[in-house]
């Protein structure tokens, strides 16, 4: 694949998406850049589905000392274990991505974001969400993208919202809001603030949703240049007669159970409904389709 680069400016800051030059053995690889902060995000999926009742997705965020122009101290001169910040960043990338994969997709997927350069001004975490989304789509993995992530700060003096603020802008802000999602839906919210009103928080979320749409639109243009080949998969879906039988007999009961305000009573009610629905199936059906029931 030839090198493809998409450089754009949004909300007063310049970004770059690039693929085709690094990590060519990965299913999809995108270098995302804001200022001089650069993160390489790779996405790879197994060819065969795993025999499991869950989606085996692994997301990792790798911090490297060389990104800040440093060499690890100590005798071995080796990188240490992942920091708490790296672990939290990996989880932040995982949350919006996980819900965007096709139902019944059981192939193992690995997303690795490696910070190659940290310019001490722009933060690498939220742009990694956009990089992960672009890498997954470049790999042709069944993923309902594009998705993006934005950090919203607010200028205390003017009241203006700032998209993906620098460290300096964030320190002077009374709001630190991270939002992940698509152009028309929010998938993840993480926030900290100094007594920001509910009205201001809702305004910030609406502003974040508009910003997400802008970043998703750029990814669409980027993907058109790449034109990836969709991955051939076989979804692990429950037989239709099972879903019809469960929905017909248990939809209303489960709805009532889930709306019980008492936590322990709610858990008991949900367990009782599940046990009742399980009795709808014969022993032979339970043995054959147990993971769907």
Predicted regions and their residues:
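A generic local secondary-structure boundary/capping motif
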Residues: 5-6, 18-21, 29-30, 46-49, ...
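Extended amphipathic alpha-helical scaffolds
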Residues: 1-46, 51, 231-293
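Gly/Ser-rich oxyanion-binding loop with an adjacent helix/lid
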Residues: 108-163
């Amino acid at each position: 694949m030839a090198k493809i680069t998409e450089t754009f400016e949004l909300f007063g800051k310049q970004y770059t998406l690039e693929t085709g030059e690094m990590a060519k053995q990965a299913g999809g690889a995108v270098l995302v850049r804001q200022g001089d902060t650069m993160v390489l995000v790779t996405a790879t999926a197994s060819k065969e589905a795993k025999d499991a009742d869950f989606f085996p997705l692994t997301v990792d965020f790798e911090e490297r000392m060389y990104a800040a122009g440093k060499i690890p101290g100590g005798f071995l001169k080796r990188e240490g274990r992942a920091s708490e910040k790296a672990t939290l960043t990996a989880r932040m990338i995982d949350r919006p991505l996980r819900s965007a994969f096709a139902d019944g997709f059981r192939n193992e997927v690995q997303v690795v974001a490696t910070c190659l350069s940290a310019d001490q001004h722009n933060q690498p975490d939220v742009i990694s969400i956009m990089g992960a989304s672009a890498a997954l789509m470049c790999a042709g993995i069944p993923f309902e993208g594009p998705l993006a992530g934005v950090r919203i700060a607010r200028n205390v003096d003017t009241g203006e919202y700032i998209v993906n603020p620098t460290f300096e802008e964030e320190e002077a802000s009374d709001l630190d809001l991270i939002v992940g999602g698509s152009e028309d839906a929010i998938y993840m919210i993480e926030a900290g603030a100094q007594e920001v009103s509910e009205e201001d928080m809702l305004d910030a979320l609406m502003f974040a949703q508009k910003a997400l749409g802008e970043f998703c639109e750029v990814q669409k243009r980027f993907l058109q240049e790449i034109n990836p080949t969709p991955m051939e998969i076989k979804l692990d879906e429950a037989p239709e007669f099972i879903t019809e039988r469960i929905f017909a007999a248990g939809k209303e009961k489960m709805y009532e159970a889930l709306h019980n305000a008492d936590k322990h009573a709610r858990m008991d009610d949900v367990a009782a409904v599940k046990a009742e629905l399980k009795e709808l199936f014969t022993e032979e059906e339970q043995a054959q389709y147990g993971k769907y029931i």
